[in-house]
C-alpha cells in the first residue's frame, strides 16, 4: 500500500468531539492577584463565551453553579442557546470547608457533607444528561510526615467512592488524579494508584480521568498512563493542557510538550479510544476564547497528523526500538499537519 493510500484512509476517520471545562472561560485569581485577572463571571457568562469559540460541542460544569444561586434550568437554557451540551459535572468538594479533606476529613460530619454534595451533583448530572460525574478530591491527602494514617486515608477514599457508585449505578464517576496541590500529597496521585483504588472498590462505573498536565508533572509518560487505563477499560475521560513539568500550569495544548502530546493522542487512537478531546486550560492573561480556539486548532492538527502517520513504518521502528527512526516518522507527520494548520 502506498503512503498516500494510507493517508486517505486515515483522513476519512471522523473528527473528534471537542470540549472544555467551563472554568476555561472564568475569571482567575491567585495568591498574589487576589482581586482577579478580570471582571467576575457567572457560569452563565462563561457558557456564553464558550459559545463564541465555534468548535466546542460539550462543557464540563462546576457544581454548585458559580456563584451559587443559579438553577439547573437556567444552565440548561444557556447551553441550548449556545448549541452546547453538558458533558460532565464537577462537584466542588475541595473548597475551604473541606480544608482537612472531603472523603478523608477527620470529622465524620464533614465527610458526610462531601459525599452528599457529590450525590447532589450526580442528581443534577442526571437532569442534564451528562456522560459522567468528575471526581477531583483535591483536599484529600496530607501535607507533612506523620500527619496522617495512610491506610485510613486510602480506606475512606475507596469507601466513599464505592458508596457513590453503588448509589448511582446508571452514572459513571471519573476520578481525576493529581500528584499535589492543594495538598502536598494527594490520595489519588497517579494512574497506578487510581487504578488500584478502583480495583479495591469492586464496582464497574468508576474510572479514570487522565489530565495530561497532571500526568506530566507527576513524572509519568502520559501516553503510557493512557495505555494502562485503556488496557483495563477504565479510561473514562481526558483533559488536555500543558506545563513545564514542575507545576499544574494548565497552559494551551502543545505549548511545551508538542511531541509527547502527539504521542498521547496516538496512544488513544491506536487503542481505539473515542472519547471527547477536552481542554482544561487556565488562560490567566490570555483571551479565553482565543486560547480555546488555539487549543482546538492544535488538537485538530494532531488529529490530522494521525492520518499522515506511516503506522507500518512506525511499528517497525518501535519493534527495533529505533528511537531516532521513530521520532523522525512522528515528526514528519506532525510537522506537516502543524504547518497546514497554521497556514490555513
Residue spans for each PLM region:
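Structural motif
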Residues: 53-56, 128, 168, 271
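Active-site acidic/histidine proton-transfer and metal-coordination neighborhood
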Residues: 2-12, 81, 85-86, 97-207, ...
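A contiguous, mid-protein "functional segment" used to position or interact
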Residues: 270-318
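N-terminal pre-domain/capping segments
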Residues: 1-120, 126, 203-205, 300-344
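Generic structural signal for well-ordered alpha-helices
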Residues: 4-6, 44-51, 72-79, 118-122, ...
Amino acid at each position: 500500500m502506498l503512503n498516500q493510500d494510507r493517508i486517505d484512509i486515515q483522513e476519512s476517520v471522523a473528527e473528534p468531539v471537542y470540549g472544555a471545562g467551563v472554568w476555561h472561560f472564568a475569571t482567575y485569581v491567585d495568591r498574589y492577584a487576589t482581586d482577579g485577572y478580570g471582571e467576575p463571571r457567572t457560569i452563565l457568562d462563561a457558557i456564553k463565551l464558550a459559545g463564541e469559540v465555534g468548535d466546542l460541542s460539550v462543557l464540563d460544569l462546576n457544581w454548585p453553579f458559580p456563584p451559587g444561586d443559579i438553577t439547573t434550568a437556567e444552565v440548561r437554557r444557556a447551553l441550548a442557546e449556545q448549541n452546547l451540551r453538558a458533558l460532565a459535572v464537577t462537584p466542588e468538594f475541595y473548597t475551604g470547608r473541606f480544608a482537612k479533606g472531603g472523603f478523608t476529613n477527620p470529622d465524620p460530619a464533614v465527610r458526610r457533607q462531601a459525599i452528599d454534595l457529590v450525590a447532589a451533583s450526580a442528581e443534577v448530572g442526571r437532569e442534564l444528561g451528562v456522560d459522567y460525574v468528575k471526581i477531583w478530591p483535591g483536599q484529600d491527602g496530607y501535607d507533612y510526615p506523620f500527619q496522617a494514617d495512610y491506610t485510613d486515608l486510602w480506606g475512606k477514599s475507596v469507601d466513599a467512592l464505592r458508596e457513590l457508585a453503588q448509589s448511582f449505578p446508571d452514572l459513571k464517576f471519573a476520578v481525576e488524579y493529581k500528584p499535589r496541590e492543594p495538598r502536598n500529597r494527594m490520595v489519588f496521585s497517579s494512574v497506578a494508584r487510581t487504578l488500584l483504588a478502583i480495583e479495591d472498590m469492586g464496582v464497574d462505573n468508576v474510572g479514570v480521568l487522565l489530565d495530561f498536565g497532571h500526568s506530566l508533572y507527576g513524572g509519568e509518560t502520559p501516553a503510557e498512563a493512557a495505555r494502562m487505563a485503556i488496557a483495563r477499560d477504565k479510561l473514562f475521560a481526558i483533559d488536555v493542557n500543558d506545563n513545564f513539568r514542575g507545576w499544574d500550569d494548565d497552559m494551551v495544548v502543545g505549548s511545551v510538550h508538542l511531541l509527547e502530546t502527539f504521542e498521547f493522542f496516538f496512544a488513544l487512537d491506536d487503542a481505539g479510544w473515542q472519547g471527547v478531546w477536552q481542554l482544561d486550560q487556565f488562560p490567566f492573561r490570555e483571551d479565553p476564547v482565543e486560547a480555546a480556539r488555539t487549543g482546538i486548532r492544535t488538537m485538530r492538527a494532531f488529529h490530522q497528523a494521525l492520518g499522515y502517520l506511516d503506522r507500518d513504518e512506525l511499528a517497525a521502528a518501535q519493534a527495533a526500538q529505533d528511537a531516532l527512526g521513530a521520532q523522525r516518522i512522528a515528526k514528519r507527520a506532525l510537522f506537516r499537519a502543524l504547518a497546514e494548520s497554521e497556514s490555513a
